[in-house]
C-alpha cells in the first residue's frame, strides 16, 4: 500500500483534482440518501390514508414527493458524471506524469543497466504497472468513493433509529478486511511471479519483432517461440492455484456477509411487526441497508484491483 500512496504523492500537483473529486462525491452521496427519506414519507402517507379514509386526500403530497425524487436523482446523475469527468482527466494526468518520469529515469540510468535488461521487458513493465495503477484510481474515484461516503452517513442514520443495526453493518467492513488480509499476502506472491513471466514474455516478443532480421538470420524462430510460449504457460499454471485461493476465500467472505444480513433483516422485520418502526421507516432502512451492501459486494473487485495496482506500483518504483 505504501508504494500506491507514493504514486499519489508523486502526482501531488493534482491536488485541485483530488479536492474537486472529493467535494462532488460528497454531494452525490448526500443526494443518494435523499431518496430513502422521500420513499419513507410517501409510504407512510399512503399507508395512513389506506388505514383511515377520513384523512385528507394526500394526492398532491404524493405528487410533490415524486417530483422531489426525480429532482434528487436527476441532480445526482449530473454530479455523478461531473465526478466521472474529473476522475477521467485526473487519471490521464497521472498517467502522463508517471510515464514521463519513468522515461526520464530510464534516460538517466547508466549504460550498464541496459546490459542486463531486455528492452521489451522494461516497456512491458511500464505499460502494465501504470495501467493497473490508473485503472484502480479511476474506479475508486468514479464509483467507490461516493459509496464509502454514503456508508458513513448510513451508519449514523441507522444508529439514530436502532443502534444494533449499526453494529451489524459496521461489522461487515472489519470482517471483510480481515478475511481479505488473509487472502492478500499469498495472492501477491502469485501475482509477482505471474507478472515476471508476462514481462519477460512480452519483452522477448518486442525484442524479436524489433530485430526480426537478426532472429531469422540465426534461425532462432522456433527457439524464441518456445521461450515465449513457456512464459505464458507458466502464467496459466500460476493462475490455477491463485484463482482457487482467491475464490475460495471470496466464498467465505460472501457467506459471512449473508449471515450478518440475515440478522439485519430479522431485526427490521420483527421491529416493524411489533410497531417500533413504521412501514415507511422499514422501507427506508431496507433501502439504506441495500445501499450499504453494494460497496461490500464490490469490495472483492476493488481489493482485486487494488492488489494489482499495489503490485504494479511496486514494479514501477523498482527501476
Residue ranges of predicted features:
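A short amphipathic helical element positioned immediately N-terminal to and/or at the very start
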Residues: 1-18, 121-122, 126, 234
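Transmembrane helix-loop-helix hairpins at lipid-water interfaces of multipass membrane proteins
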Residues: 18-82, 159-164, 275-279
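Hydrophobic alpha-helical membrane-associated segments
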Residues: 27-31, 35, 67-91, 171-186, ...
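Transmembrane helices of ABC transporter permease
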Residues: 13, 17-30, 142-193, 264-277, ...
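An intracellular "coupling" helix at the cytosolic face of ABC transporter transmembrane type-1 domains
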Residues: 12-13, 111-112, 128-137, 141, ...
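Hydrophobic alpha-helix/TM-entry signal in multi-pass membrane transporters
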Residues: 17-22, 62-69, 117, 135-136, ...
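Cytosolic ends of transmembrane helices, especially the final helix of ABC transmembrane type-1 domains
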Residues: 220, 244, 292-319
Amino acid at each position: 500500500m505504501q508504494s500506491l500512496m507514493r504514486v499519489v504523492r508523486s502526482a501531488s500537483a493534482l491536488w485541485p483534482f483530488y479536492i474537486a473529486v472529493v467535494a462532488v462525491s460528497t454531494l452525490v452521496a448526500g443526494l443518494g440518501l435523499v431518496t430513502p427519506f422521500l420513499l419513507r414519507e410517501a409510504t407512510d402517507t399512503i399507508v395512513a390514508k389506506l388505514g383511515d379514509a377520513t384523512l385528507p386526500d394526500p394526492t398532491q403530497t404524493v405528487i410533490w414527493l415524486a417530483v422531489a425524487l426525480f429532482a434528487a436523482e436527476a441532480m445526482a446523475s449530473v454530479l455523478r458524471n461531473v465526478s466521472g469527468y474529473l476522475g477521467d482527466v485526473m487519471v490521464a494526468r497521472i498517467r502522463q506524469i508517471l510515464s514521463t518520469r519513468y522515461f526520464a529515469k530510464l534516460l538517466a540510468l547508466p549504460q550498464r543497466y541496459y546490459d542486463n535488461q531486455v528492452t521489451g521487458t522494461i516497456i512491458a513493465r511500464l505499460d502494465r504497472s501504470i495501467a493497473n495503477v490508473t485503472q484502480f484510481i479511476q474506479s475508486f474515484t468514479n464509483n467507490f468513493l461516493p459509496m464509502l461516503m454514503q456508508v458513513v452517513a448510513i451508519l449514523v442514520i441507522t444508529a439514530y433509529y436502532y443502534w444494533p443495526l449499526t453494529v451489524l453493518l459496521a461489522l461487515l467492513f472489519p470482517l471483510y478486511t480481515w478475511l481479505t488480509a488473509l487472502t492478500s499476502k499469498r495472492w501477491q506472491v502469485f501475482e509477482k511471479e505471474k507478472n515476471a513471466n508476462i514481462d519477460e514474455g512480452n519483452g522477448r516478443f518486442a525484442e524479436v519483432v524489433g530485430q526480426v532480421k537478426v532472429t531469422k538470420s540465426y534461425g532462432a524462430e522456433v527457439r524464441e517461440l518456445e521461450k515465449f510460449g513457456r512464459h505464458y504457460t507458466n502464467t496459466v499454471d500460476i493462475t490455477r492455484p491463485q484463482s482457487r485461493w482467491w475464490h475460495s476465500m471470496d466464498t467465505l467472505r460472501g457467506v459471512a456477509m449473508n449471515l450478518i444480513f440475515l440478522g439485519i433483516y430479522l431485526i427490521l422485520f420483527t421491529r416493524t411487526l411489533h410497531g417500533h418502526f413504521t412501514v415507511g421507516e422499514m422501507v427506508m432502512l431496507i433501502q439504506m441497508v441495500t445501499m450499504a451492501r453494494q460497496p461490500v459486494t464490490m469490495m472483492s473487485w476493488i481489493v482485486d484491483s487494488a492488489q494489482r495496482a499495489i503490485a504494479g506500483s511496486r514494479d514501477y518504483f523498482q527501476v
